[in-house]
């Protein structure tokens, strides 16, 4: 018979790395073609003019200009790049 309890193992102690999601460039800021504007899971934001969407739903600029956040006619949050 043991006179001390065995040291039990913990089932906790794990965590995943942060994915660094969110808005990377805000409204009114200047971007060049290829700049990432938003990293997201699913389409919280939709692509507008001069913007495209990657297969992981990342929104990036396809032209140089200024970022504009707005709502489209269907009520969806949309991001566009306004060229100079």
Swiss-Prot record:
InterPro entries: Ribosomal_bL27 (IPR001684), Ribosomal_bL27_CS (IPR018261). Residues 1-21 are annotated as: Disordered. The keyword Chloroplast does not apply. Pfam families: Ribosomal_L27. GO terms for molecular function: structural constituent of ribosome. One of its GO terms (cellular component) is cytosolic large ribosomal subunit. GO terms for biological process: translation. Gene3D superfamilies: 2.40.50.100. It comes from the Bacteria. PROSITE patterns: RIBOSOMAL_L27. Keywords: Ribonucleoprotein, Ribosomal protein. The keyword Transport does not apply. Belongs to the bacterial ribosomal protein bL27 family. HAMAP family: Ribosomal_bL27. NCBIfam families: L27 (TIGR00062). This is Large ribosomal subunit protein bL27. The gene is rpmA.
